[in-house]
């Protein structure tokens, strides 16, 4: 499991928010203990085998009496506990070793461990040769460091001693599929009808391939796609009856590929060419539900969607259910162009990082918004959400007719103002599209030095009063935004937008005195057109 978020880039608002969300899912640093107790356990292999043998005998003797706790206990004993030099011996002595690095104090580790144990049980049952192990990286920090475990929880697959970082989902099924793909078993073959129900009990999302023979170009491309995809289980069969059990919508006995998902849009037929790239493209566009519920553990998966224009509905669960059916119809209509995501608005850890971008405080009112991760833009449905208004909003997004949303204060009255107040909604008109040169002061309420600079700007505005081609303006960056107002967090900031060159504003040093700024304005704007300079304050 990848633990360290990629560096945050200013070019993508949605990327930034998803990485914020990852902070709720992942702990990226761990503490080192005062002592590092490490010991060998040379008899652990035989002890483990004996424990598993006892478990299997008990299950045979009283299968109906096994409690859930006993089942979990058995699963956890399948996972080898590593420590000290024993770790290196295990990794070097086995072709495939999956290691979970955890810490006892880490809540996410505690959540993942039973799923990891469940995956270990499933892999053992299907005859996988991978050895599943775990190590307390807090206690055995030296070994954890040597394994390059840099945070908790971390999942690493060692193939002949070389590690691969796990980058899949957090469910047991996700882990099993990923491990199978990486250890040489990307496809499950079903030969008889009797095998199908057992398969359906274990797998809820899968790709079905029906072939006359497991050879030829079409099958080869299917296999290549199975090896390239790390998320979805691929299944192959030569028996059309098996295929129809798995995919009841199957109408033909010819070569066939289809995707099965556990949701409203359960069966999706692939009708493209039999090329690996096209099959993977089909999966990328169709693997998500019509409406994906965002959780702390699936943010990376959501971000992997090739559909980067994403509609997000924030509401309470009951309110979402009331809209569920019409929303599914809308999502189906715009499936190839928009991705639809539901966020429980009562989960502040998930909802608030998004809502704060729109200046929306915590509440229970349904909000519909959208992010375009390619254009770094966001949109907001400002009317009351209803099936009709949501569909109209989505249609506008798909056709590019919805205006971008900028967080903005109300438009102020600037009549007779010596310094124009700019807000998000007026940035285009007053700054970018105006014919005048604009000296813009960017400030925030918490800025220590902003008040002193504001007084200098007011003095300059009075000094240059009467110069029609020069406008003094200011904007509160904490309450207003615009995609072309790209500034750092060091306020105050002075920007000069020269007429005809608005795309490349000049940034002035805030250490300049009022006289220095006056000289700069005169040299940049006034002297070329007017021989009379006005720099004496």
Swiss-Prot record:
EC number of the protein: 5.3.4.1
Motif Prevents secretion from ER covers 534-537
**Which keywords does this Swiss-Prot/TrEMBL entry list?**
Disulfide bond, Endoplasmic reticulum, Glycoprotein, Isomerase, Redox-active center, Repeat, Signal
Mind telling me which GO cellular component terms the entry cites? endoplasmic reticulum; endoplasmic reticulum lumen; nucleus
The entry annotates sugar attachment on 160, 364, 416, 530
Q: Where is the signal peptide?
A: 1-29
Enumerate the subcellular locations listed in this protein's record, separating them with semicolons: Endoplasmic reticulum lumen
Kindly indicate whether the keyword Repeat belongs to this entry: yes
Which branch of life, at top level?
A: Eukaryota
Per the record, what are the reactions this protein catalyses? Catalyzes the rearrangement of -S-S- bonds in proteins
Per UniProt, the enzyme's principal EC class comes to isomerase
Which Gene3D superfamilies does the record cross-reference, listed alphabetically?
Answer: Glutaredoxin
> Tissue range of expression?
Widely expressed.
The active site lies at 106, 447, 450
Q: Which PANTHER family match?
A: PROTEIN DISULFIDE ISOMERASE, PROTEIN DISULFIDE ISOMERASE-LIKE 1-5-RELATED
Which function does this protein serve? Acts as a protein-folding catalyst that interacts with nascent polypeptides to catalyze the formation, isomerization, and reduction or oxidation of disulfide bonds.
Q: Which family does it belong to?
A: Belongs to the protein disulfide isomerase family.
What is the protein name stated in its UniProt record? Protein disulfide isomerase-like 1-5
**What is the scientific name of the source organism?**
Arabidopsis thaliana (Mouse-ear cress)
Name the gene. PDIL1-5
